[in-house]
């Protein structure tokens, strides 16, 4: 008798368990005209634990092409999560020895990383990386069936990291950015862009102070730094680029120093000194080629230090005046009227950094076709990342006079209490005089007034009077 006997070839075994399972991934097969028959997307899945897995795949073609890839997901609860993908392909199209035979190596990297905001209040890391060589999607068989991926013209990647050392007030933050144009294989990369910040501290303050505070203990300073390194190039030239000659880099420092002192118990003195330094790896010297009637640029590589500084000092005090209204006229409602006068004067100075002794500005003679000669001024550091100090000397004296008038009256809600009423919250005048200016050194006179008429309503007005309007 014909008794049906069921026969089956096991294709895969998937046990239903509560734990993660590792196992083989069966490949798919097919035929691709340029690369031949293939087995692809076969490999092994590693269920390492409930926080991390790994999938390894491979592909091979009968005409010599092959590729491997690795994909991983990770997740640590309340800490971080992300995914990573890497693929490498060695693609050979056509038959070896024939004129249309081509061989290309390409790869792709994707990385996404997210950190929980509560994981570490002092440090953070985030990443969104999507990098691929320009030929990768054209050689990837999966992309042929995904027009959106195949026609993608730009890719962007970024990684950012920051940390804070609260005990010393130091903060670091860094980013790396990459932009790709897949059509012409151009790359714009910044690696790294680092910011350093040191919060205000008092370098001369004694750890174990005894007695009154010394004047030098009131001197404070801070620091900010910025390091940047960037390049615009082609994909195949990136790994062969020279850090000094091909990359655009620099380091900028800023150090403000200040203090606050009291003179004769009534006058507040506040000096300050600001220093900025720029470090570059090259400069561009310019000259004029009279025969060709064009400017000639000569790039000189080496360490270049470009700095500038400024200083200032200010003095201010407060003068108080009181008026007790006559009770016969005003009764006992108004207790007193107070007038506070705050005069201040400040002086700021910065030298002329276009002077020849600094070397930040140069000149050359340009001989025109008609025989006339012009003197051209330029800066060898004009196109650098952090610029060049400005031209011109500064010597400025500023004056300011501020008035405040308040009235102390009995509170209608409390028979034993008093409250303050603002009559004139501020009435101020300010003007400055530039000693370095060759003409019109006096600035305009600025007057400002602020009145608080009601609890939530403030009136502000500013008027400017031109010092040389009738000159």
Where are the model-predicted features located?
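Outer-membrane beta-barrel proteins and related beta-barrel translocases across Gram-negative bacteria
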Residues: 1-471
């Amino acid at each position: 008798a014909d008794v049906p006997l069921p026969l089956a070839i096991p294709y895969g075994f998937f046990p239903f368990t509560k734990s993660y399972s590792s196992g083989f991934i069966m490949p798919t097969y097919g035929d691709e005209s340029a690369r031949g028959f293939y087995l692809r997307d076969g490999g092994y899945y590693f269920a390492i634990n409930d926080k991390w897995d790994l999938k390894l795949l491979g592909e091979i073609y009968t005409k010599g092409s092959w590729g491997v890839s690795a994909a991983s997901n990770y997740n640590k609860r309340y800490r971080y999560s992300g995914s990573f993908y890497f693929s490498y392909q060695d693609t050979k199209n056509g038959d070896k020895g024939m004129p249309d035979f081509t061989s290309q190596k390409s790869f792709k990297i994707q990385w996404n990383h997210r950190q929980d905001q509560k994981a570490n209040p002092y440090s953070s890391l985030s990443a969104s990386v999507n990098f691929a060589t320009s030929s990768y999607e054209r050689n990837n068989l999966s992309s042929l069936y995904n027009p959106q991926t195949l026609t993608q013209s730009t890719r962007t990647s970024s990684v950012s990291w920051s940390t804070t050392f609260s005990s010393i007030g130091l903060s670091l933050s860094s980013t790396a950015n990459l932009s790709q144009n897949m059509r012409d294989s151009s790359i714009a990369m910044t690696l790294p862009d680092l910011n350093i910040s040191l919060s205000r501290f008092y370098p001369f303050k004694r750890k174990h102070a005894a007695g009154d505070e010394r004047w030098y203990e009131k001197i404070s300073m801070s620091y900010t730094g910025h390091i940047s390194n960037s390049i615009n190039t082609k994909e195949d030239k990136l790994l062969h680029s020279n850090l000094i000659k091909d990359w655009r880099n620099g380091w900028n420092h800023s150090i403000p120093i200040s203090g606050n002192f009291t003179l004769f118990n009534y006058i507040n003195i506040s000096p300050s000194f600001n220093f900025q330094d720029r470090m570059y790896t090259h400069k561009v010297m310019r000259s004029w080629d009279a025969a060709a009637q064009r400017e000639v640029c000569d790039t000189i590589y080496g360490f270049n230090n470009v700095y500038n500084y400024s200083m200032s000092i200010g003095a201010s005090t407060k003068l108080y005046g009181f008026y007790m209204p006559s009770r016969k006229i005003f009764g006992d409602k108004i207790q007193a009227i107070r007038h506070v006068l705050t005069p201040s004067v400040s002086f700021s100075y910065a030298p002329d950094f276009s002077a020849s002794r600094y070397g930040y500005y140069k000149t050359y003679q340009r001989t025109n076709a008609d025989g006339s000669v012009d003197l051209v001024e330029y800066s060898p550091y004009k196109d650098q990342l952090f610029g060049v100090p400005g031209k011109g000397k500064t010597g400025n004296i500023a004056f300011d006079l501020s008035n405040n008038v308040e009235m102390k009256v009995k509170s209608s809600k409390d028979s034993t209490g008093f409250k303050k009423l603002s009559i004139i919250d501020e009435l101020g005048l300010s003007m400055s005089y530039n000693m370095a200016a060759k003409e019109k050194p006096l600035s305009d006179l600025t007057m400002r007034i602020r009145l608080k008429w009601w609890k939530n309503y403030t009136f502000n007005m500013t008027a400017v009077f031109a010092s040389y309007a009738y000159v």
